[in-house]
């Protein structure tokens, strides 16, 4: 049996045409202060932030931006707030300032379609195998843990990818350099949350009994089951099917993945 579901929720009014009403605040920065929020005409689970455009690779990048004014950095030192190895963001209104006017809609946490597939297979006499898959297609997740473990700040427990951060010897990297605390909410930490999970497998076998044995025991069955046995995902975190906050959908702040469990049972029926 295959099930499919779709849910669409749009904000119709918040009292203002342009205002974003925050539902989850950025714990490490006040610009912008929110990551999730309600805005008229947008999904209920809308994600907001700056559009991350990598880092300044070389002086030529900085010089060319003097003409185009396409990008801007978060700290206003140097030419137009730029600096080699620092992150750059899309300057939406081309005013040379990184502020609320550059915050954009980064996607909805709601999946396009979700559901499951399950079936039971009877093999020979007494053996049955049941499988159950769940899935979610589309939608985005915000990896809040990257504000701590994927920034250039001098703090412990960094993600391995930070070994590839920008340096003079690695000038093509789009990961901000060490020593720069990149804690702004941006598209850098927004990921496709699609997944397919083998939720459970159940195997049962009924042992054949002779007529004589059935006078004492009517049935003996053995069972083996497992939960959360396999997960396919695009998300680089542990598991996109997690949530840290009860206020918003799909926010990962170092959440533990769903545990894998096994069970064995013997059933005797007299």
Region spans (language model):
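Strand-connecting loop/turn motifs
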Residues: 124-126, 217-219, 259-261
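Outer-membrane beta-barrel pore domains and translocons
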Residues: 3-7, 134-136, 223-229, 269
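Transmembrane beta-strands of outer-membrane beta-barrel proteins
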Residues: 129-131, 218-224, 264
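Repeated loop/turn-to-beta-strand initiation elements of outer-membrane beta-barrel proteins
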Residues: 126-129, 210-211
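C-terminal beta-signal and terminal closure region of outer-membrane beta-barrel proteins
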Residues: 22-57, 158-159, 163-165, 170-171, ...
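Residues that define the transmembrane beta-barrel architecture of outer-membrane proteins
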Residues: 111-115, 194-199, 258-262
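Conserved small-residue
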Residues: 1-107, 227, 234
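Extracytoplasmic gating/loop element in the C-terminal half of outer-membrane beta-barrel translocons
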Residues: 70-72, 81-84, 136-227
